[in-house]
From Swiss-Prot:
Gene Ontology CC, one term: nucleus
Organism lineage: Eukaryota, Metazoa, Chordata, Craniata, Vertebrata
Region of interest (Disordered), residue spans: 1-22, 112-165
GO biological process assignments: brain development; camera-type eye morphogenesis; negative regulation of transcription by RNA polymerase II; nervous system development; neuron differentiation; positive regulation of transcription by RNA polymerase II
Tissue specificity remark: Expressed in unfertilized eggs but not in early embryos up to stage 13. Localized to the nervous system at the end of neurulation, and restricted to the central nervous system, eye and head neural crest cells by the early tadpole stages. In adults, expressed throughout the ovary, and also in the testis, kidney, brain and small intestine.
Keyword line: Activator, Developmental protein, Differentiation, DNA-binding, Neurogenesis, Nucleus, Transcription, Transcription regulation
The protein, known as: Transcription factor Sox-11-B
Compositional bias ranges of the Low complexity kind: 155-165
Comp. bias regions, Basic and acidic residues: 1-15
Provenance organism: Xenopus laevis (African clawed frog)
Function: Transcription factor that binds to the DNA sequence 5'-AACAAT-3'. Acts as a transcriptional activator. Plays a role together with nlk in neural induction during early embryogenesis.
Segments of skewed composition (Basic residues): 144-154
Length: 374
């Protein structure tokens, strides 16, 4: 009976298939009889091998038998390349073996949970000298002092560079020379510690004052340039009044406008005389027609002939650009003696061009055609 049982067991363990042959030659099959087949010497439970690990374990032993002097890293490289070159049909037995080992691992260790090893943390304080370990209170102070210095230095250097750039922009640079702060020695520490924030605030205030001053200067220059361009305006504008007579004339024109009298200007006659060296602008107001409208308001039409000439740029004239109002000044005395209803009653200073314009038909059918005809 005992012999038959031995024979049955031997027949059962004989490798009849490829899987049996693989199991027989597998190195893991020899260790499965041990209950702790998947534990290390320290008691750590290893993970079950996958297909590549099963195959590489067998092939590694073969390579080590053939070339024992080969490095382990070189063997791993060769095994990885060979595993990639294998066909799927050649990998099937190793995949099945890995699945069998996984199921056995689950049966032997049902409460297993993968927990990777944590690397032991090296205590940095253990390598320090005992003198430093005994006085830990001084180290934070020194670190904090070291941290303060780099914070203050860039701010001060940034302000100095900013002030230098501002002064160079406005033409003030070159008066002061700032040296680069030294980063070594006690002097640097003293500079960091005794930095006063009031000095920085004063510097910022000075910079703001300089900016405001420059802005004011620019505004004044712009105003002066605008005044030069605003010379040739309508005679009734207050900016054109340069004498008392002109101011009286401007006031009277404004009063006429308020009382209902409308002023119309004609700028058709604009001629250029190249023979005259200096540019003059003459304004000759002439009473062309005074009629009584159906509403009973007096409408006065003016012809302002503006004579513009080109000025030689090499010969600037201080009087150029001023409006010559000699005719208006002379006729102010005769305003009270006028026979017409308007106070603008001038002697006959008509030129041939003005007489041609006066002879034309000034009364248009539409009221809008009378205003600012060009």
């Amino acid at each position: 009976m005992v012999q038959r049982a031995d024979m049955d067991s031997s027949q059962h363990t004989e490798p009849d298939t490829e899987e049996g042959e693989f199991m027989a030659c597998s190195p893991a099959a020899l260790d499965e009889s041990d209950p702790d087949w998947c534990k290390t010497a320290t008691g750590h439970i290893k993970r079950p091998m996958n297909a590549f690990m099963v195959w590489s374990k067998i092939e590694r032993r073969k390579i080590m038998e053939q070339s024992p002097d080969m490095h382990n890293a070189e063997i791993s490289k060769r095994l990885g390349k060979r595993w990639k070159m294998l066909n799927d049909s050649e990998k099937i037995p190793f995949i099945r073996e890995a699945e069998r080992l996984r199921l056995k691992h689950m049966a032997d260790y049902p409460d297993y949970k993968y927990r990777p090893r944590k690397k032991p943390k090296v205590d940095p304080t253990a390598s320090k000298s005992p003198t430093l370990a005994q006085s830990p209170e001084k180290s934070p102070k020194s670190r904090s002092a070291g941290k303060k210095c780099p914070k203050l230095k860039p701010s001060h250097s940034g302000n100095s560079s900013k002030s230098l750039s501002i002064k160079s922009e406005y033409g003030v640079g070159g008066d002061y020379v700032f040296g680069s702060p030294k980063s070594s020695g006690k002097a640097a520490v003293m500079k960091c510690v005794f930095m006063d924030e009031d000095d920085e605030e004063e510097e910022e205030d000075e910079e703001e004052e300089e900016d405001e001053l420059q802005i004011r200067i620019k505004q004044e220059e712009d105003d002066e340039s605008l005044r030069l361009y605003n010379v040739a305006k309508v005679p009734a504008s207050p900016t054109l009044s340069s004498s008392s007579a002109e101011s009286v004339e401007g006031a009277s024109m404004y009063e006429d406008i308020r009382n209902g009298t409308r002023l119309y200007y004609n700028f058709k006659n604009i001629t250029k005389q190249s023979t005259i060296p200096q540019a003059t602008i003459t304004l000759a107001p002439r009473p062309l027609l005074a009629t009584t409208s159906p509403a009973g308001s007096h409408e006065l039409l003016f012809d302002l002939s503006l004579n513009f000439t080109q000025q030689n740029p090499q010969l600037p004239d201080p009087n150029s650009g001023n409006v010559s109002l000699s005719l208006v000044d002379k006729d102010l005395d005769s305003c009270s003696e006028g026979s017409l209803g308007s106070h603008f009653d001038f002697p006959d200073y008509c030129t041939p061009e003005l007489s041609e314009m006066i002879a034309g038909d000034w009364l248009e059918a539409n009221f809008s055609d009378l205003v600012f005809t060009y």
